[in-house]
């Protein structure tokens, strides 16, 4: 320990209080007062950021802990008539989305703690119907609220296979990110079933289909340039919002992009934040390789430690872009053992002048997007903002010359 540090520590415990000690004492007093009294602020006072009491355990973005003037969650002018679970009783767009909620993130006091999770008898509150989908960590079922007759989606996490900390993390990321118009709405409240078999939380129901189902319905023809631009305008807006909060989705794929109107693709939302982590977080790699994984992930061994980086989302977006346009994937795995990917990498490195045939229909601007998203050098990849600018006005496919008949 340096002499200056020794002197500072001595002053903190033996001598007069230093500036650092007074600041720490003040912050502790603020936290204690909040936990003991919970006094509501005057409605005329402006919102102030509160101390991050749960940052080390939950690791949330800073803006996720902003509060409104009454220390309650701003909930988009929703009416909460349900007895146990706060789900909106009205379904109009004006009531479901408010300007205040979409422009800011707020949180109700205590919702980021590891308090005991409330038990709820699902049969008393909901009529649970068919299963909508399943994933690595849980499954989703369609349900109808008995009082309001509103359809919602319930995401279940089997308790034997789920740690409470993992469930709380996913709920909080889902809840805090849902103010964005292109991210699935998650309603307030973490619960567990009365028989202790599962944790669950409630989200809005998508009546149409996922992007995967929409593309498969085209019989490998793709959804077209116009619809692809609409989808990516929404998805890139959501991912750019997450990246601005230093959060990485880490599981972007067509199944996790929901299409609420399959006719014009006017309403698109991103879902599933089970693997979401903060930038620079260290995680263990799991044996789970899919078409969307970046090259650096495909060469990783099981349980190897990785540092979370935004560039993995950018790679996945490049794959999704190709999938929307062509109706199929460019390759099965981003490894040199996979010939289609090896050909792409050889062209990127200029070792082969011939562009892979799969990419021939794309324009120069679209090829630039691929080069800046599907490059094995993750530091050279674009940001979500760069991709959004490229897709805004540029043509994605080459112009096809129509032969003029000769008379």
Swiss-Prot record:
Chain residues that bind ATP: 132-140, 155
Residue ranges constituting the Protein kinase domain according to the UniProt record: 126-397
Active site per the UniProt annotation: 251
Record's compositionally biased regions (Polar residues): 33-57
Enzyme Commission number(s) from the entry: 2.7.11.1
GO cellular component: a single term: cytoplasm
Family membership: Belongs to the protein kinase superfamily. Ser/Thr protein kinase family.
PANTHER family per record: INHIBITOR OF NUCLEAR FACTOR KAPPA-B KINASE EPSILON SUBUNIT HOMOLOG 1-RELATED, SERINE/THREONINE-PROTEIN KINASE SBK1
The protein's name: Putative serine/threonine-protein kinase C01C4.3
Organism of this sequence: Caenorhabditis elegans
């Amino acid at each position: 320990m340096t002499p200056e540090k020794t002197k500072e520590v001595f002053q903190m415990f033996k001598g007069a209080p230093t500036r650092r000690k007074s600041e720490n004492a003040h912050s502790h007093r603020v936290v204690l007062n909040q936990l003991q009294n919970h006094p509501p602020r005057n409605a005329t006072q402006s919102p102030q950021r509160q101390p991050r009491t749960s940052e080390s355990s939950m690791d949330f973005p800073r803006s996720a802990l902003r509060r409104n003037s009454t220390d309650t969650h701003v909930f988009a002018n929703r009416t909460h008539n349900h007895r146990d679970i706060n789900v909106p009783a009205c379904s109009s767009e004006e009531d479901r989305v408010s300007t205040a909620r979409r422009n800011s993130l707020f949180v109700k006091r205590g919702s980021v703690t590891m308090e005991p999770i409330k038990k709820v008898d699902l049969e008393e509150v909901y009529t649970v119907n068919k299963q909508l989908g399943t994933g690595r960590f849980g499954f989703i079922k369609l349900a109808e609220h008995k009082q309001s007759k509103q359809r919602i989606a319930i995401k279940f996490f089997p308790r034997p296979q789920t740690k409470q900390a993992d469930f709380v993390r996913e709920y909080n990321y889902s809840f805090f990110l849902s103010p964005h118009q292109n991210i699935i709405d998650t309603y307030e409240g973490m619960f567990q079933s009365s028989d202790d078999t599962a944790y669950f939380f409630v989200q809005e129901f998508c009546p149409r289909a996922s992007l995967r189902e929409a593309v498969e319905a085209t019989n490998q023809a793709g959804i077209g340039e116009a619809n692809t631009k609409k989808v990516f305008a929404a998805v890139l807006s959501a991912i750019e919002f997450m990246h601005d909060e230093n959060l990485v989705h880490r599981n972007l794929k067509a199944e996790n992009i929901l299409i609420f109107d399959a006719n014009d693709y006017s309403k698109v939302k991103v879902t599933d934040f089970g693997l979401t982590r903060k930038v620079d977080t260290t995680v263990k790699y799991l044996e789970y390789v899919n078409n969307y994984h970046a090259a650096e992930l495909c060469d990783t061994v099981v349980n190897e430690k990785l540092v979370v980086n935004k560039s993995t989302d950018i790679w996945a977006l490049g794959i999704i872009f190709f999938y929307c346009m062509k109706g199929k994937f460019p390759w099965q795995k981003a490894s040199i053992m996979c010939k289609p990917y090896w050909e792409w990498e050889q062209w990127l490195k200029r070792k082969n002048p011939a562009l892979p045939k799969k990419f021939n229909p794309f324009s120069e601007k679209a090829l630039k997007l691929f080069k800046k998203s599907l490059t094995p050098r993750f530091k050279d990849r674009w940001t979500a903002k760069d991709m959004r600018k490229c897709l805004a006005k540029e043509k994605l496919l080459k112009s096809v010359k129509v032969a003029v008949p000769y008379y």
